[in-house]
């Protein structure tokens, strides 16, 4: 099955809502985004702001977190 980052990138690119993204992560047997995890909370913010994958990666990099790959 696809990696967690691939699923998240695809969901961002498709502009899916956060609940749809959580469902996609579950269906692909990947862990859901968890707000108490710093990187995940940045990703949750990106979904809320409808950021692109590129803008999300810029934000992750600025926050010293691994970019989506």
Regions found by a protein language model. Name each.
Residues 3, 15-20, 52:
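Helix N-cap / loop-to-helix initiation motif
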Residues 12-15, 29:
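Generic short alpha-helical segment signal, independent of protein family or function
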Residues 1-13:
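Short, basic-rich loop-to-helix N-cap that marks the start of a DNA-contacting helix
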Residues 20-51, 57, 61-69:
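Short amphipathic recognition helices of helix-turn-helix/homeodomain-type DNA-binding modules
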């Amino acid at each position: 099955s696809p990696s967690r980052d691939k699923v998240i990138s695809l969901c961002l690119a498709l502009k899916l809502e956060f609940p749809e993204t959580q469902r996609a992560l579950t269906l692909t047997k990947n862990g859901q985004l968890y707000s108490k995890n710093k990187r995940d909370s940045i990703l949750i913010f990106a979904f809320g702001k409808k950021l692109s994958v590129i803008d999300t990666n810029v934000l992750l990099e600025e926050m010293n977190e691994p970019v989506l790959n």
